Regions:
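Alpha/beta-hydrolase-fold enzymes
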Residues: 24-122
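Catalytic histidine-centered segment of alpha/beta-hydrolase-like enzymes
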Residues: 183-196
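Active-site nucleophile elbow and catalytic-triad environment of alpha/beta-hydrolase enzymes
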Residues: 117-140
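Short beta-strand/loop motif that positions the catalytic acidic residue
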Residues: 144, 150-152, 156
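Short, hydrophobic alpha-helix immediately C-terminal to the catalytic nucleophile
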Residues: 10, 14, 36-40, 202
Length: 208
């Protein structure tokens, strides 16, 4: 999969639509990028049952986020992600030995390398930059026609400055941007049984 694969999301939504009068979309991190892109890229006719969406801690500019993840302070995150992805690649190779060449794994030192050798190639992109360019949701935000909220914390270590679409938010009344000072990446811890972000999600969606 990749973070711009909106056809997967469209398939799931169409599957559940007959069972509901109203549908609300919520996505976190790369899942949030998927939801924002789905709402704005115009590839599918969105059902009128989809009332509103919320996206949390989203790298709306995948290239910018990939650069942010290469910062020295993110070394542990980078290593952890690569370890998880490498394990998944070996498992997939066992399942499909003739379809998946994992020799390039030894060349992967950072997430951009993984996207260059695997994410992009497996999903039909020319390279990592082509993938980032086409899958990033930022370019589609001004086209979003349904009520949508994006919450990106200013201290999120995975986000570059370009992942705060202030200009785009000013151009689209359907798109709401919140940039709390704290929250990290999908953190937003608060007192009580619910996270601060969960309160914001419910407050926004209950308005529609």
């Amino acid at each position: 999969y990749h973070s711009g694969k909106t056809d997967d999301l469209h398939t799931v939504i169409n599957y559940v639509l007959p069972n509901y009068d109203s549908v609300y979309l919520v996505g976190f991190s790369l899942g949030g990028n998927l939801i924002l892109k789905y709402n704005g890229d115009g590839l599918f006719n969105l059902s009128s049952k989809i009332k509103a969406s919320v996206a949390i801690s989203v790298p709306v500019d995948l290239k910018g986020s990939s650069i942010a993840l290469q910062r020295r302070e993110n070394t542990l995150y980078n290593w952890r992600f690569l370890l998880t992805l490498s394990k998944k690649m070996y498992l997939k190779h066992k399942q499909f030995p003739d379809d998946l060449d994992i020799q390039s794994l030894k060349l992967v030192k950072k997430l951009t390398d993984f996207d260059e050798y695997f994410t992009s190639k497996i999903n039909g992109f020319k390279n990592a930059q082509d993938y980032y360019s086409k899958a990033s949701s930022k370019q589609f935000i001004t086209n979003i026609s349904k009520p949508t909220l994006l919450i990106n914390a200013l201290d999120d270590p995975f986000l570059s400055e370009s992942c705060f679409p202030i200009t785009e938010a000013k151009k689209n009344l359907n798109f709401n941007l919140m940039t709390p000072r704290y929250g990290g990446h999908v953190g937003f811890i608060s007192k009580g049984d619910f996270y601060w972000s969960e309160h914001q999600i419910l407050n926004f969606l209950n308005s529609y």
